[in-house]
Amino acid sequence: MNLRTLLILGALSAFGPLAIDFYLPSFPTLARQFGTDVEHVQLSLAAYFVGIAIGQLFYGPLADRYGRRVPLLVGVALFTLASLACALAPSLEWLIGARFVQALGGCAGMVITRAVVRDLCDPLASAKVFSQLVLVMGLAPILAPLGGGLLLNTLGWPSIFHSLAIFAGLCLLAVLLWLPETRPQHLQPAPLSGAFGQYRALLGNAPFMGYSLAGGVAMAGMFAYIAGSPFVFIELYGVPAEHYGWLFGSNAAGFVIMAQVNARLVRNGGPALWLRRMVLVYLASGLCLLVLALWQPLQLWPLMVPLFICVASLGCVLPNATACAMAGQGRHAGSASGLLGSMQFSVAASASALVAFLHDGSAMPMALVIALCGAAACGFAWWSKRFVV
């Protein structure tokens, strides 16, 4: 895979984290703007997760039937228009609806990127490519909160969504010019009825389900952190909105670094082995975070240490779980990618909503959900040990 293709796929993969992380510093501002509280603003985040979960179920079969390019172009165009609608939101209800539509467009890049990697790479190479994609898309959670905080303080919250529209427009142009069709020509286009019917077979595929759920609940812990951190950092511990991005970015840097380390680790033992090892690190750091949250330290830094370890470990967990789940999917790579992403973001939406539901003015809800996700990820990863990928 050449560098240009890798960069385009990385940018498309970044739609999800960029559209999430870019507006996180604006949560308190949006609450004041619309005369509500942060917990209700978090519903716009949950709506985005629900949109991604639903949309991926459709893009997968469409990519298997019509190829990778056409559904991708439609999705990126929809994301661009919905971003502009978010910028014009006169109410929180409008913003929540526009975020849902934005997710329906943005998930095209996430689904079809995984399918393209599966088209071009075997399982071991896929694990390495997914780790490299994390490096590209990992710039989003590092730079997005910083940029979002800067735009918030200089141009106001609508500029955040204007910037997302510009980014999506550039990605649309890049796909048109430089990303060819990658679906193997020897594969007959899957009929839509058969493509959607493939979901039943995938749901009964134990290796696919085990590794998909391991990655899904691990990702849910990440999004529990994303949903809870604006309140914990800014409201609970008084971190200025413009400084929030530095703290968020430090954790994201750990995620990116470990993803690059993972590309080397999988050479010895394969992705399944390192998935099982790193979910143990994820669980241990999540439990440590929960204990500290119950202790309620007066300063933020005791919570930041286990948070950093937890997020960094996901740099190994997520690419390996994805590579294992996508192994052997062949003709139905699009459907497999769609179902994988849908399950992951369904769980993520539930986790972010649970953090909001449990809100009690402390860091405990965020920490509890992260610890529970770590335990579930361990269970699914080790249950899947019996399967060879």
Regions found by a protein language model. Name each.
Residues L78-A85, E93-V101, W301-L307:
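Paired small-residue
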Residues C324-G361, I370:
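A late C-terminal transmembrane helix in Major Facilitator Superfamily
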Residues T182-S212:
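Juxtamembrane intracellular "pre-TM" segments in multi-pass secondary transporters
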Residues A98-L139:
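Cytoplasmic helix-loop-helix junction between adjacent transmembrane helices
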Residues G35, G67, L88-W94, G105, ...:
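Helix-breaking motifs and short loop linkers at transmembrane-helix boundaries and internal kinks
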Residues I54-E93:
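Conserved MFS/SLC helix-loop-helix module at the cytosolic interface between two early adjacent transmembrane helices
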Residues V70-L84, W274-L289:
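Structural signature of the two symmetry-related core transmembrane helices
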Residues W94, L124, S131-L177:
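Helix-loop-helix hairpin linking two adjacent transmembrane segments in secondary transporters
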